[in-house]
């Protein structure tokens, strides 16, 4: 049976220099664990899991430090390890503080109404359309609330929150018209 590269971690760590290892310290009150190259981060706002099976690097968690070492020594390999490090950093920040996107409902003539039901956002009366435009809420821990002319999206997972905001914005895109004139829609105006 052929072995996978991450099963030979000791061999790879012994071969390369220590310069190309990117490290990340885990703050207090947060626990990071890894099972089958799936990293889970736990904190006061919940847990986040991310699968790193296709990452061409070695992941090691020791003494509250996450070590990421790429297999190669090229610039692209270092960029991949830095990207994985920033993803884990975003997971830690999300579990500590959470992320919040604020979107503004903009309309000129037909008043847009936004409702949240069953993990979906319904945009009604967009340009007087009788059928509601539907966009999906990504992730179980992502919450969407409507406060007047604002739509607030919050949650611990940055990718889920930003993808939900993108889904809402894309569902209200105006097609076959000049977008400088027809400005109706829902747009992101604040990221926290």
Task: Describe each model-derived feature in a short phrase.
Residues 2-192:
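Ribosome-associated RNA-binding proteins
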